[in-house]
Amino acid sequence: AQLVVEQHTVIIDRLAICRMDEKGVRSNGYLVTAWAGDRADACCIIHGYADGSIETPSRPALSASFYANSFLENGQNRYDLSRLATAMDSTGGGHANACGCRIQAPGVDANLETWLGMWANRDEELAIR
């Protein structure tokens, strides 16, 4: 998983985006945020398969997980990441610092575009006051 994180993670506007989809690898946010260090406030991990399903645990559906960077001082409870998880998937959720959802049509790139737009406006859309 470490190698996938190193090779398939980009940081955009302090959000580490790790593409584990189609790779048969999963991770939680600790590995990604530890790798990103102080360059990211949170991460988004994409995992699963485009042809996956919730009925096939060995080949799960595409999904995204969001995690606050708990390695940063005051890294948690700054942004409500569950707003990202529920933006397009009504069954998504979790809590402000760790949450997830299924990728919605038309696909990963469109979902990422929506989430990055929300993240770019995070002080208004996602900030916990």
Regions inferred by a protein language model and the residue ranges of each:
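Hard-cation-handling environments
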Residues: A1-I12
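Glycine-rich, acidic loop segments that terminate in or are immediately followed by a histidine
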Residues: A16-R129
